[in-house]
Amino acid sequence: MSLFGDTIAYLLSLIEDGEGKAELAEKLHCWFGGKEFDLDSALEWIKNKRCLTDIQKALIGASICFLKPKDQERKRRFITEPLSGMGTTATKKKGLILAERKMRRCVSFHEAFEIAEGHESSALLYCLMVMYLNPENYSMQVKLGTLCALCEKQASHSHRAHSRAARSSVPGVRREMQMVSAMNTAKTMNGMGKGEDVQKLAEELQNNIGVLRSLGASQKNGEGIAKDVMEVLKQSSMGNSALVRKYL
């Protein structure tokens, strides 16, 4: 995959699946695909995207600034504050040393990625802030390599947290994870489905999940809710009360 393709993949790995992720993916493919765009407008879009966390906004914003460093008229607080607000004085010092001594000597994406892999996330955040404030001191490949290494660490943390919740010894936590996954699937189908039948089916699924939450699903059968939602989406001939009859 190309340099920009790798960057898009790492950035999207940070975001939870859903309609917002699909919309962001389309934007990233346009920005990194060579189409001309206004940097300030793109940054405003990222800043106001509610489905993104502060760190995610900062990383995505920094990545497109690395594409067009000469077009940036001013530094953005929504980028600098999350990058500089994490970690201790010691980790920030490590990030500064990483940026000033090691990354300045790098010339390629993979070289920067491999060096960044050996540092903790808070140090990489501060290193990225230094790169963002002094873009002329680093090549675009080095800046994107450092950013992608950080994205991999962040995505790994999120995956472990999600897996821990999915394997929780508390049945209620496992059941709610299934409920959330099922609701996200139904809401995405409702938002992106173009056919009236698909949207109607998605609304029925959301109502069914609401009933299950209100009245309570059995501990034993709660595990299969998300899978059943997917099956209902594939086989729309099922009755709208199928889930309720099965789990109550």
Curated annotation (Swiss-Prot):
Region annotation RNP-binding: where it falls in the sequence: 165-248
Keyword Aminoacyl-tRNA synthetase: no
Domain of life of the source: Viruses
UniProt xrefs under SUPFAM superfamilies: Influenza virus matrix protein M1
InterPro entries: Flu_matrix_M1, Flu_matrix_M1_C, Flu_matrix_M1_N, Flu_matrix_M1_N_sub1, Flu_matrix_M1_N_sub2, INFV_M1
Keywords of this entry: Host nucleus, Membrane, RNA-binding, Viral matrix protein, Virion
GO MF, one example: structural constituent of virion
Gene Ontology CC: one annotated term: host cell nucleus
GO aspect biological process, one term: viral budding from plasma membrane
Motif Nuclear localization signal in this chain: 101-105
Region annotation Membrane-binding: where it falls in the sequence: 1-164
Protein location: Virion membrane; Host nucleus
One Pfam short name: Flu_M1
UniProt xrefs under SMART domains: Flu_M1_C
Membrane topology field: Peripheral membrane protein
HAMAP family reported for this sequence: INFV_M1
Binding partners and assembly: Homodimer and homomultimer. Interacts with NEP. Binds ribonucleocapsid by both interacting with genomic RNA and NP protein. May interact with HA and NA. Cannot bind NP without genomic RNA.
Additional observations: Influenza B virus genome RNA segment 7 encodes the M1 and BM2 (AC P03493) proteins. Normal translation produces the M1 protein. The M1 termination codon overlaps the BM2 initiation codon in an overlapping stop-start pentanucleotide 5'-UAAUG-3'. Termination of M1 translation triggers reinitiation on the BM2 AUG in the +2 open reading frame. Most abundant protein in virion. When expressed alone can form virus-like particles in transfected cells.
Physiological role: Plays critical roles in virus replication, from virus entry and uncoating to assembly and budding of the virus particle. M1 binding to ribonucleocapsids (RNPs) in nucleus seems to inhibit viral transcription. Interaction of viral NEP with M1-RNP is thought to promote nuclear export of the complex, which is targeted to the virion assembly site at the apical plasma membrane in polarized epithelial cells. Interactions with NA and HA may bring M1, a non-raft-associated protein, into lipid rafts. Forms a continuous shell on the inner side of the lipid bilayer in virion, where it binds the RNP.
Family: Belongs to the influenza viruses Matrix protein M1 family.
Record-given protein name: Matrix protein 1
Organism: Influenza B virus (strain B/Lee/1940)
